[in-house]
């Protein structure tokens, strides 16, 4: 899809990794960092993964790219508010200083789609999180929001180069 818009997509699983090596995870990490260093932008899939929030690896990648001053875009195929997803996963109740979960730990409640650090990283680049108006039929494979980010990246990158 990136090629249709004049971009070259870099996907972490494209890295060549020796799965028999003793340090496979470190090799994967180094390969991913190498790709991020090579990239001019990131389109982060912030769809909640194995819990109410984005994948921690993707959160790291977004922060890494932001720290390097590279264009940051993101999307989530789940447009619901973070605190609502936490509620679906378990108890959320009022605490002394805000909402807490069943263990009494604070639950972030800023009416955002995910953790404030992720959402506002995108805001810094004037690229708000892209979410679908209606939930997609296939949360994991629908590329509508991703394509919207690819279009936005193309416009921003080519406008910058012009």
Residue ranges and their predicted role:
Residues 1-162:
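Conserved catalytic or regulatory cores that recognize and/or transform ribose-phosphate-containing ligands
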